[in-house]
Amino acid sequence: MPITLDQQYVISVGDTDVVSINYTDYLNSGELLTGTPTVAEVTTAALTLSNKIINTSTYTEADTGDTVAVGKAVQFAVTTSTAGAYRVRVTCGTDATLARTKVVDVLLEFK
């Protein structure tokens, strides 16, 4: 089973929000994410997941204040009309000489 991130997102039902998964701590020095990330709901099919990308500009994490460099995070939009807790699996390859695939789960709670 993949690592489940400590950070849990709380989103209002009906909102469309952007979720950003920072892989910086999982990547080696100089290693970047590459390819098209896979973002899939694990437990149900109630979420609409769209715009799945590797970040193309730096951003600052709201909860930590950390600046995330280009190519170090996967971002996607999510919405639902059903309250509940959801598990989403995020998978992305890297550009390492011996390419790796990084997989994490993130918990989303819609209220």
Task: Describe these PLM feature segments.
Residues 1-31:
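Predominantly extracytoplasmic/ectodomain segments of secreted and cell-surface proteins
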Residues 91-95:
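Beta-strand-rich extracellular modules
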Residues 98-104:
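Extracellular and select intracellular beta-sandwich modules with Ser/Thr-enriched
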Residues 105-111:
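Short beta-strand edge segments in extracellular beta-sheet folds
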Residues 79-85:
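Surface-exposed, short loops/turns at beta-strand junctions within beta-sandwich domains
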Residues 64-75:
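Aromatic sugar-binding surface patches on proteins
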